[in-house]
């Protein structure tokens, strides 16, 4: 049975440095996925994640459990990566190139966009990935956090600092843009709803 974040954090606050390593190991995979999507470069993401965990360690005594630890952590990852992208003069965009996104791509398309299409071919997967990457950054970030990271709307609000209504609108618009773009690329006519 694994320890809860609260138990691990309590041990860290009591001076057990090894427990911080346990906390990092527990969350680094998902944090890295988010960092790679934002920065689109594994090396930059690793550097940003190192900065993130230093910030987390320093701020841990002030963490108040108003949200889950993972939500708080993702907020720090998000802010650190957006800042890093800005310093490099790059536009903030999220990517679907990270390993393990195959199932997420299937879900994006089969559940929400074009329910009659089976996501079997690599060509179709490429189209989906390309169109998600073409989303305007404002829509792409909210959409990716919701669909790929499987965050709740409330968690996205906490991570990004964007109001709930705005998050909902951005996800809705992202889905609409994807539906149109994928249908156009696949030469399907959009059915009137």
Language-model features: locations:
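DNA-recognition helix of helix-turn-helix
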Residues: 82, 128, 139, 145-148, ...
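Structural recognition of an alpha-helix C-terminal capping motif at a helix-to-coil junction
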Residues: 33, 47-54, 67-79
């Amino acid at each position: 049975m694994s320890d809860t974040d609260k138990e691990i954090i309590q041990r860290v606050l009591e001076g057990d440095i090894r427990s911080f390593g346990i906390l990092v190991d527990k969350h680094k995979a998902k944090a890295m996925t988010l960092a790679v999507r934002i920065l689109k470069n594994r090396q930059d993401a690793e550097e940003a994640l190192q900065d993130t965990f230093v910030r987390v360690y320093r701020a841990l005594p002030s963490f108040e459990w108003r949200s889950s630890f993972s939500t708080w952590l993702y907020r720090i990852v998000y802010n650190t990566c957006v800042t890093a992208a800005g310093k490099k003069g790059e536009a903030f965009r999220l990517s679907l190139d990270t390993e393990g996104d195959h199932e997420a791509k299937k879900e994006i398309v089969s559940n929400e966009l074009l329910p009659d299409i089976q996501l079997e071919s690599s060509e179709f997967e490429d189209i989906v990935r390309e169109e998600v990457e073409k989303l305007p950054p404002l829509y792409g970030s909210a959409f990716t956090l919701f669909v790929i990271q499987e965050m709740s709307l409330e968690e996205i609000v906490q991570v990004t600092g964007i109001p709930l209504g705005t998050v909902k609108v951005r996800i809705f618009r992202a889905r609409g843009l994807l539906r149109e773009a994928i249908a156009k690329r696949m030469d399907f006519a959009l059915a009137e709803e």
